[in-house]
Amino acid sequence: MDIKELQKIMQENGVVGAGGAGFPTYMKLTDKAEIILMNCAECEPLLKLHRQLLEKHAYEIMKTFDMVAETVGASQAIIGIKKSYVQTINALNQHIEEFPRVKIHLLDEVYPMGDEVVLIYEATGRVVRPGGLPIEQGVAVFNVETLYNVYRAVEEHKPVTSKYVSVVAEVENPVTVKVPLGCTLEEVVAQAGGTTVKDPVYFVGGPMMGRIGNGSDPVTKTTNAILVLPKDHVIVMKKQRTSSIDLKRAASICCHCHTCTDLCPRH
């Protein structure tokens, strides 16, 4: 299979990044990619979707990862995964010898290791300039679920019509479920036995980078998790707070030492 053929399959089956901004997958398939990375850092608290999916479908995802590397001509295919995800690592090690091109890079348990710029530096030593794209450094990064969707499109000829979503926090039975695209957040939460608090707030995504949603909002191709929280939870209150309040607090506390900027992984 050549790059154009794989790109066509991705377009026809609606495969996009299953997290973040939902970047079209076919646009990452280029012969400029010297290294491809699988992002299984998953550093948002409470979220386990990627490691669960990779553990359950290790062979299928690794096979697809190797196929993508061969198609674009990448010399390395690196799985970036935190060293604490022991069960998932064990599942990968059962098949790693079948794919000589694929390597596992163990990551430290720090935040924000899942940020692709941080991941690229930790796994390859390459630095993406501020505002730049990974491909400028010869790297393409793929989400675990995205690669599983590539597998389903190539091997099973199935388009992306469903999404894996973790439902956690104030629910009866925290669970990861497979649901059709377009169903509401309330319908997904019902699969976890319903909420355990009155007037719940549906927080879409992880507690660090997520947003407040509405129960009638639809599941999209980038919906990874739903956190059900009480309305007075500190995370909810922080998201509802205006930025001007945070700026005033920062101005009253900051001594302009510049250390936070020096240490910021995005700087």
Question: Can you describe what each PLM-predicted range is?
Answer:
Residues 234-258:
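Ferredoxin-like iron-sulfur electron-transfer modules
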Residues 82-86, 200-219:
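Short acidic beta-strand-loop surface patches of small beta-rich interaction domains
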Residues 1-123, 251, 267:
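Iron-sulfur-cluster electron-transfer modules
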Residues 72-79, 197-205, 264:
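Flexible, glycine/charged-enriched surface loops at secondary-structure junctions
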Residues 78, 83-183, 191-196, 206:
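Hydrophobic alpha-helical positions that pack around
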Residues 176-178, 210-225, 233:
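Extended, low-polarity segments enriched in aliphatic/aromatic residues
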Residues 259-267:
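Iron-sulfur cluster-binding cysteine motifs and their immediate structural context
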Residues 182, 187-189, 202, 264:
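Short alpha-helical segments in extracytoplasmic peptidoglycan/chitin-binding modules
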